[in-house]
Amino acid sequence: MPFRIANVWEMTGDDKADIKFGKMPDKIQKKMLRTSLRKAGKLLQTAARGMVAKDSGALRASIKPKAAKRSRKNKHIIAVRVMTSSKAYKGEYFPGGHVEYGTQFQSANPFMRPAADQVRSQVIAYFKQDLKAAIAESGKGK
């Protein structure tokens, strides 16, 4: 399994929204979570793309958000990952990892961690707002 640069955050939600959300069918929960996570992940994607070196643009283009799967043990823990694509691998060479962490010949030029630190609170706030809006919208349809 290739190494991927990723930032995974865990957070807890609002109790009232959690109760409404828990009463919904699993399929609807999953769809709402993934949609809200992807939207929130785009904030981190934009920040990371802005901080990465612009040489060929391939590394910048490979940075994409992905909604991680929920844990079966605790369905209340969800995650969004923004990572470089596996298409960026070139044999033994992984440009994302080499740029972020450096090598023995190249100094590190971090872009993913600083981007995550910069927009963390915005991503969490946006996700909570978007998910609450989706829950409220689904309640109006009944």
Task: Locate the predicted segments by residue.
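Short, Lys/Arg-rich flexible segments
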Residues: 1-79, 83, 87, 96-142
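Carboxylate-rich helix-loop segments that flank metal/cofactor sites and access channels
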Residues: 90-91
